[in-house]
């Protein structure tokens, strides 16, 4: 990555001894790009590029779900996976306050607080997985098991 500043997510991956590579993609400064476009711009299969979604449960606790960019979160399955009656996506305006990240640059690693995190079980079928590194324009790629460990996450079937 050269002299590019490391993000909190990158520092945590290094601290946890997770081997990763950083990959930049073209974007307009500060403008979020959808995940399928990110995958295409990096020449990667969207099945191995994951997005980080933040929800709030009926208990008012926050939960993080990480799913393939082309998939849709099954809110009922997601709620079941964390023992909640229901979960709902948080409003875009709350993302930075809750996570410390911006929309389009939200990483499952290195949020302000450690929220309960669940990856869709499809991640276990991938050789490598890409997630945001905490800023728009850069993704990190690493082995799924290492990423799950660094994010202190579980896996469950949470997509349709």
For each feature predicted by the language model, list its residue ranges.
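Extended, low-hydrophobicity, polar/charged segments
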Residues: 1-160
């Amino acid at each position: 990555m050269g002299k590019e500043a490391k993000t909190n997510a990158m520092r945590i991956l290094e601290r946890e001894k997770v081997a990763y590579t950083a990959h930049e993609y073209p974007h307009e400064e500060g403008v979020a790009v959808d995940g399928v476009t990110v995958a295409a711009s990096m020449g990667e299969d969207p099945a191995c590029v994951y997005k980080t979604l933040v929800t709030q449960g009926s208990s008012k606790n926050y939960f993080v779900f990480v799913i393939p960019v082309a998939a849709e979160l099954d809110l009922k399955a997601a709620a079941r996976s964390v023992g909640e009656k229901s979960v709902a996506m948080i409003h875009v305006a709350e993302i930075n306050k809750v996570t410390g990240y911006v929309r389009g640059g939200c990483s499952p690693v290195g949020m302000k607080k450690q929220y309960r995190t669940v990856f869709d079980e499809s991640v276990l079928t991938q050789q490598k997985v890409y997630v945001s590194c905490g800023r728009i324009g850069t993704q990190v790629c690493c082995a799924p098991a290492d990423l799950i460990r660094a994010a202190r996450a579980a896996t469950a079937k949470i997509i349709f």
